[in-house]
Regions:
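Active-site-proximal segments of metallohydrolase catalytic domains
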Residues: 211-287
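Short amphipathic, basic-aromatic surface patches that mediate peripheral association
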Residues: 23-62
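Short coil-to-beta strand junction motifs in C2/discoidin
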Residues: 57-69, 190-191
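Extended acidic/polar, glycine-enriched regions
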Residues: 100-167
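Catalytic Zn2+-binding segment of zinc metalloproteases
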Residues: 308-324
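Short pre-active-site segment immediately N-terminal to the catalytic Zn-binding motif
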Residues: 185-188, 283-308
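Fold-level signature of zinc-dependent metallopeptidase catalytic domains
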Residues: 144-203, 216-226
Length: 465
């Protein structure tokens, strides 16, 4: 009786205890400056965001070994690792372009982590020869009087698009609108819900919808749409998104990191998707930064899912025939991305457990025929963009391209096999993808087996199963 009573009292006491409050969200904004030969980092500001830390306190350490960059938050007194994450950055992409050979640029970047109780050391590392090398450190004292605790201007009401649980137990996706006027707010909400359904209609997200919360924020724009310099269109949209990033007409990013982070701080999030109020084909995606898509493009469903694959799981582009601004690497090493390989050791293929016995490595496919077809398509595409042809004509070209791709690839002997198919990572030779077709290769509607597994691994980092 005594034991039962004691147990009951303990249980009652536990149930009446308030849940431990989540720590605040601390953000270190910094500048990343350099060119192809050197780089410099400098602190901009340290802020406390308006909302508590949205992550699971039991999942603070990143063991995926993904990203070109990696940061650690260490206790300054003991060196104990408190938090870590891998990520990519706009600077990391820009430095691989021709411009970086003869010019310096500065980009604003941010590191977000649970606010510490005691001083911490921030360690930033960069991947070199597939090892992370320390490139910058700085110290943060949570009692520093210069830490900015002010609240930025509100971007408007937070839209609850899909809530399946508390932020700490789910992967939290924030959908932001850019280029939507106050009168177009209802359009943004409809667009956000439409793309949410598109994402969770695509495996493996479809099977994990319950593991996600989805939120929406849409700061009002003075003018409808975002900038597209190649079309003579310039807008001062709230998030600063623009086509023609690095001179690539379809690549849409924003370099207005401060504005982006201040708006996003009004939602619990780990991942960001920016909907652009435009109909011209375009988008972009950077691992653990954000993804973008032109909401009214006919190909938006494909672009949305493809670019989110980059942002969410660090998936590489598997295509190699479209124009990009990046220069090929001087030295070929094994890519860190989970869905491409240099096949330096065929016996140790990173997805070998998914390869059926008897599948040849490398795996044959009608590459010459495919390359010839794509060469014609890309020549037409460049000509049409140079002539500023109507978007309807571009859509017709893309439909023709997809039809030819499907006819060519669907009937191939290894069309459904996991293997190592040459042509990936923007290179025709020397890099290989896991399956003949995938949404990361063409406008195919789904992910391959390797990409699906990589996505599920990241879901497990943020959602309590």
């Amino acid at each position: 009786m005594k034991t039962k009573l004691g147990l009951s009292v303990c249980l009652l006491f536990a149930l009446t205890l308030p849940a431990l409050a989540a720590p605040a969200t601390m953000r270190l904004d910094y500048y990343h400056t350099g060119d192809v030969s050197h780089e410099v980092f400098s602190v901009d500001r340290v802020v406390i965001e308006p909302l508590p830390w949205p992550g699971d306190p039991a999942k603070t350490i990143d063991r995926t070994n993904l990203g070109n960059y990696f940061f650690e938050v260490q206790d300054a007194a003991t060196g104990r690792l408190l938090y870590s994450r891998g990520f990519n950055s706009i600077y990391g992409e820009w430095v691989t372009t021709e411009e970086a050979k003869h010019a310096h640029r500065t980009f604003s970047e941010s590191l977000r982590f649970p606010a510490p109780e005691a001083p911490v050391k921030i360690v930033l590392k960069e991947r070199e020869n597939n090892q992370f090398k320390e490139v910058w450190t700085t110290n943060v004292d949570p009692k520093d009087k210069f830490i900015d605790t002010s609240r930025p201007p509100s971007p408007g009401p937070l839209v609850n698009i899909q809530k399946n649980g508390e932020p700490a137990t789910k992967a939290d996706l924030l959908i932001l609108g850019d280029g939507y006027t106050a009168a177009e707010r209802a359009k943004f909400e409809n667009d956000a819900r439409r793309f949410t359904d598109i994402l969770f209609g695509t495996p493996p997200f479809r099977e994990h919808r319950q593991d996600f919360n989805v939120w929406g924020l849409c700061p009002a724009a003075e003018e409808s749409g975002v900038s597209r310099p190649s079309g003579g269109v310039h807008r001062r949209s709230p998030l600063g998104a623009s086509y023609d990033t690095f001179g690539t007409e379809r690549y849409v990013l924003t370099v207005e990191n401060r504005a982006l982070r201040d708006v996003a701080s009004y939602a619990p999030y780990e991942f960001i998707e920016i909907l652009l109020n435009n109909n011209t084909y375009g988008g972009g995606g950077i691992f653990n930064l954000y993804a973008t898509v032109a909401a009214d493009s006919e190909w938006a469903p494909y672009v949305f899912v493809h670019e989110f694959g980059h942002h969410f799981a660090g998936l590489a582009d598997e295509y190699y025939t479209s124009d990009v601004a990046y220069l090929p690497p001087e030295k070929r090493t094994e890519p860190w991305e989970p869905n491409v390989t240099a096949l330096l050791d065929p016996a140790d293929l990173k997805w070998k457990d998914l390869v059926a016995p008897g599948t040849p490595i490398p795996t044959p496919w009608p590459k010459e025929q495919f390359d010839a077809m794509e060469k014609q398509i890309q020549e037409q595409r460049r000509k049409m963009r140079a002539e500023n042809r109507p978007e309807a004509e571009m859509n017709a070209l893309f439909k023709e391209e997809r039809k030819k791709e499907e006819e060519m690839l669907a009937s191939d002997k290894y069309a459904k096999s996991v293997g190592a198919f040459e042509g990936a990572n923007y290179e025709s030779k020397g890099y290989y993808r896991p399956q003949e077709n995938c949404i990361m290769f063409t406008r195919y509607p789904s992910f391959c087996e390797v990409c699906r597994r990589a996505i599920e691994r990241i879901i497990g980092m943020y959602a309590s199963q």
